Amino acid sequence: MTGTMDSASEYVNKWLIKANNDLKVAENEIKLPQEDMVTEAICFHSQQAVEKFLKAYLITKNVEFGKTHNLEFLLELCSKQDKDFGKIDVGNLSFYSVEVRYPNEFHIPSGDEAKSCIGIARRVKEVVLKKLEIGKSELNI
């Protein structure tokens, strides 16, 4: 993805930038003192990062995924393209896409849960960028 990018690669690049920005929000929040940390925000933004990284990969493979926040489904679609995605465990990260944002499913994740969510997001980022043969400097991320 060097040189002049066509509209398809620009679109993928935008997904990757959005994904990375979500990860940055989570990483910045987790650096705060425990009493100031908003762990549900960390988990939510980690989930969003994973979702967007996986969708960016699927777009490059012309795989339709519809409107979904289900990481297991997206990961399954990715695994059909490349078996290495089958080695990724997203745990219960899909829970944080919607449920954690509303009081009817009230749950405050622990600091350890938040760290785990960021770890998953970092792993997915690493795999997606490797598969797309994109260096961090190419995206300024």
Put a short name on every predicted segment.
Residues 1-141:
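Terminal alpha-helical segments
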